[in-house]
Amino acid sequence: MSDTETPGEHPVGIDTLLDRIRTTYARVEPQDAYDATRAGDALLVDIRYAALRDRDGLIPGALVVERNELEWRLDPQGSHRAPEATGHDLRVIVVCNEGYASSLAAASLHQLGLHRATDLVGGFQAWRAAGLPVTR
């Protein structure tokens, strides 16, 4: 056992980790995410790198937060929270490029008490492929 392992736990690969995480909440399809944000029922949070946003465009109305700042910006108790981080009952839909990093990010938000956090199946690429709004 390594110094970082918990007794009784075994290391897992990223695919297994994602599978485990994704069983703890319902992920959202692009059209459902669009409808929820238009209705004011969810906050869409784009965690893609600036280079990807520059290359592919932005989702109108999405809060852009770099992945390495996500927890600090969305923690309702944090001193660096975004104005949109209104409480632990906030429904957050995290968007990355293809829907992988966003699953890990949503799980991290759950640990902060944002239990309605989820992510977008297929990420930004699925959003764009569905013909949903993108700005340059």
Q: What is the meaning of each model-derived region?
A:
Residues 45:
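Active-site flanking residues adjacent to catalytic metal/cofactor-binding acidic residues
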